[in-house]
Design a protein with these regions (language model features):
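Short loop/turn segments that flank or connect secondary-structure elements
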Residues: 1-168
């Protein structure tokens, strides 16, 4: 597993992002059955990426919380739903409930989540590379949006691009 340097990751993604976004736009319009390729790409990326070496998602992004997430975490912290919401969360312009600020208040100094076992559903699924609805993720621009934050997403999209180069 390669050592991750966020600065070099950022430079790398900035060079590649326009081509990769164009690839994802093409992919969204294609009729290719993606799940088989996505499963293979997902297996391969975790041989090269260690999330704890990065935690950029927790430092630069915020999950979308479900009401169930908020109840579960609030109960764990000994707070009411409203107390937890008022202290840590806000509702954004899309009506999604998100963290009030970044980095995430649950990110430890060691890049580990201090509520890992009860973390939000969105965090559990991130970077969404092992989903059954890959086409939906491509069409909804999940990977396009995550590309500049997440080395695993970058590698996933690059692997898909390599696998599908002769099919698009």
């Amino acid at each position: 597993m390669r050592k991750l340097h966020i600065a070099s990751f950022t430079r790398s993604v900035n060079k590649k992002k326009y081509k990769l976004r164009a690839f994802l736009r093409k992919l969204a319009q294609s009729k290719i059955r993606l799940n088989r390729y996505a499963r293979q790409a997902d297996k391969e990326i975790w041989k090269e990426v260690n999330c704890l070496a990065c935690a950029n998602c927790c430092k630069k992004m915020t999950p979308t919380y479900t009401k169930r997430d908020i109840h579960r975490i609030a109960r764990h912290l000994g707070l009411t739903y409203q107390e937890y919401y008022d202290k840590y969360l806000r509702t954004d312009e899309n009506n999604d409930i998100i963290n009030r600020k970044t980095p995430c208040h649950f990110l430890g100094k060691d890049n580990k989540c201090i509520i890992y076992d009860i973390r939000p559903l969105d965090c559990r699924g991130f970077p969404h590379t092992n989903r059954k609805d890959i086409r939906y993720q491509v069409q909804e621009k999940t990977y396009t949006n995550n590309l500049t934050y997440c080395p695993a997403t970058l590698l996933f999209v690059e692997k898909l691009q390599q696998m599908l180069a002769d099919k698009l």
